[in-house]
Amino acid sequence: NETHVDALAVSIGTTHGQFKSKAKINYELLKELKAKLGPVGLVLHGGTGVSDEDMKRCVREGMKKINVGTELNKNYIEVVSKTFTADDVTPLTSLRNLLGPANERIKEIVIDKASLFKL
């Protein structure tokens, strides 16, 4: 409270990037941090790969922002790669047509994640 920060990224068991092993979120530490930091918005870095249930619980326990940039990047690149290598792509193909499917995929993911944060 003395620092007057709006948000603080905390380490409670996740890391940047996507990993094959399941994140082991330390909920006791999250509760303790929330109790000590009061109104400061807590941020979870490394939300990519965190299960939907864990995300919901993090929000219930006080997390205000969850970063999932790696998931967004991965999906965007996958869709762009498929679109750019399609048989009907020519040098005259509009960028809107090439990037539109990737933008739609990101929109779907963001809507899905936002639904997890509504409790």
Q: Where are the regions a protein language model picked out?
A:
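Conserved short-loop catalytic and cofactor-binding motifs
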Residues: 17-21, 46, 94-101
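Alpha/beta enzyme core
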Residues: 1-38, 52-57, 61, 81, ...
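Short, ordered loop/turn segments at secondary-structure junctions
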Residues: 13-14, 46-47, 71-73
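Hydrophobic faces of well-ordered beta-strands that scaffold small-molecule active sites
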Residues: 8-10, 42-46, 64-68
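C-terminal alpha-helical cap/extension of soluble enzyme domains
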Residues: 51-119
